[in-house]
A protein has these predicted regions:
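Short alpha-helical scaffolding segments that buttress acidic/His motifs in well-ordered protein cores
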Residues: 59, 72-76, 113-117, 121
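Amphipathic alpha-helical segments used for helix-helix packing
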Residues: 34, 63-91
Length: 157
């Protein structure tokens, strides 16, 4: 967020006007550059009862090791291109994994799980809410896995 177009262009060895010409602003440049692979595990290989646990553990590990997703989430709140990039990550990566796994309302279930995980990420990595930031990984999994599992198991209304 503190980077300037001039500094970015200088690092790339190009004129700042080229960055502005092709991207328009820093937000659009960031959204175009943000590359994040969720590296989802093969969920079909996980026992049904363990899906909530595996999903929460995986997302927690991904958010902890790569600042790109936190930066993209922060930008998505106020920048349309970053928001669209987040939607693209969901549509291209999360949704297909859940569609292979669940036949009943897979898109809705994936969206609810994604919302749960993103809401948690906002609290822990952006707002840095206490006690969320003090919780251990195991505490987080213990609290959140049953909720995610419920999204998977509960019959659709």
């Amino acid at each position: 967020e503190k980077a300037t177009i001039r500094a970015i262009a200088g690092t790339a060895g190009i004129d700042p006007s080229l960055v502005m010409r092709y991207y328009g602003n820093k937000g659009k440049l960031f959204a175009a550059a943000a590359n994040f692979d969720l590296c989802l595990p093969e969920l079909s290989a996980v026992s049904h009862e363990e899906l909530g646990t595996v999903i929460v553990q995986h997302f927690l590990e991904r958010w902890e090791v790569d600042d790109t997703m936190v930066a993209l989430l922060r930008a998505a709140v106020s920048n349309e291109e970053a928001r669209l990039r987040m939607v693209e990550i969901f549509t291209d990566q999360s949704l297909p994994a859940f569609e292979e796994l669940l036949t009943d309302h897979a898109a809705e279930r994936a969206a609810l799980i994604g919302g749960q995980m993103i809401g948690f990420a906002v609290c822990r990595y952006i707002l840095r809410l206490s006690p969320v930031i003090e919780m251990t990984h195991q505490d987080i999994v213990n609290w959140m896995a049953p909720i995610v599992q419920q999204y998977i198991d509960t019959p659709a209304p």
